[in-house]
Amino acid sequence: MNKPVAPNSYKTGPDEEGMFGIFGGRFVAETLMPLILELQQAYETAKNDPEFKAELNALSTFYAGRPSKLYYAEGLSKHLGGAKIYFKREDLNHTGSHKINNCLGQILLAKRMGKTRIIAETGAGQHGVASATVAARFGLPCIVYMGATDVERQKPNVFRMKLLGAEVKPVSAGNGTLKDAMNEALRDWVTNVEDTYYLIGTAAGPHPYPELVRDFQSVIGTEARQQILEQEGRLPDVIVAAVGGGSNAIGLFHPFLDDASVKIVGVEAGGRGLEGEEHCASMSAGRPGVLHGNRTYLLQNADGQILEGHSVSAGLDYPGVGPEHSWLKDSGRVDYVPILDNEALDAFQLCTRTEGIIPALESAHAIAQAVKMAPTMGKDKVMIVNLSGRGDKDVHTVGKLLGMDI
């Protein structure tokens, strides 16, 4: 976590104030400031503590099942007839997605800080499930805030959370999606600062959350880099990941940022198209503003009011993005592109039929970008796609959209 970086590196952020260039920071209520500073101090101490690292490593290995595999998607690659596509199989982790990586790190932090109550927000339910899972593992009560719309479209995950002992609180404000759930979680945190740890699920929020979530998720890219060198004897030409808040993406991207030969592509939710407001492509169609404690690219109207946005994928249905992604966009290191709902649905089906792997709708956005890019590349080229989660949670949504009666 603490390797020295070159002065011209893309890995130098954030600074002491939590800024990545003009993005990031700590825009929070005064009551939260002492807690934020306490968390920052606890994290600085923990990441330099060999015992903390050893405990996290043991849990990652024996509980979560790391390292996750880097799998050559031969069927999909041959179908597309271009670059060799590899999947980083985060769907094989305990709880079915990349979310467990961050939750294990943060629950250990909460323990060190003496917190006795866990709160979390969730969109697709994967972070809620992972939070409820680690809370159950360590015997702590867990409250998960989830938009009412998402509660409806992610019923299997709602049941899993309840089964794990968590209390799921539906949020009906706004569109009843991830932004609204995060608002409620922040309100809870402000009123319960003494005993409560807010386990944020994405690489956004006030500093130090974007940094610590990135660090806990960077295991994805660290492993993928080593695995591709073992399997191909070289670095990939392209790496691709879906971006909602951006934790799975920054986890894959960060270890590759200083590899100039590697093209990096983040895939946003283009929804029903960028012309109207039915999308969540904050970097393709938004502008900088402040939300949930940090300055970043946001979907907002002319008055600066945050728009609701839309995506077929509950996990990408967020009108902002982590501040490090905003900085990487402006610095030109990472390309961010939108994928439409129907393109993601097509990729969902194509992956299932060519690979026998049902991907999460979030991951299907990244696969859809691979479907566009791979045929334009030579067969000697190599691409890694982050398969951030499995699609069991999405089969009802997809079934309904395809006109099937499930």
Swiss-Prot record:
HAMAP family: Trp_synth_beta. InterPro entries: Trp_synth_b_CS, Trp_synth_beta, Trp_synth_beta/beta-like, TrpB-like_PALP, TrpB-like_PALP_sf. Belongs to the TrpB family. Pathway: Amino-acid biosynthesis; L-tryptophan biosynthesis; L-tryptophan from chorismate: step 5/5. GO terms for molecular function: tryptophan synthase activity. The lineage of its organism: Bacteria, Pseudomonadati, Pseudomonadota, Alphaproteobacteria, Hyphomicrobiales. Its EC number is 4.2.1.20. Gene3D superfamilies: 3.40.50.1100. Its cofactor is pyridoxal 5'-phosphate. It catalyses: (1S,2R)-1-C-(indol-3-yl)glycerol 3-phosphate + L-serine = D-glyceraldehyde 3-phosphate + L-tryptophan + H2O. The modification N6-(pyridoxal phosphate)lysine is found at K99. NCBIfam families: trpB. GO terms for cellular component: cytoplasm. The beta subunit is responsible for the synthesis of L-tryptophan from indole and L-serine. Keywords: Amino-acid biosynthesis, Aromatic amino acid biosynthesis, Lyase, Pyridoxal phosphate, Tryptophan biosynthesis. The gene is trpB. Tetramer of two alpha and two beta chains. It is an enzyme of class 4 (lyase). This is Tryptophan synthase beta chain.
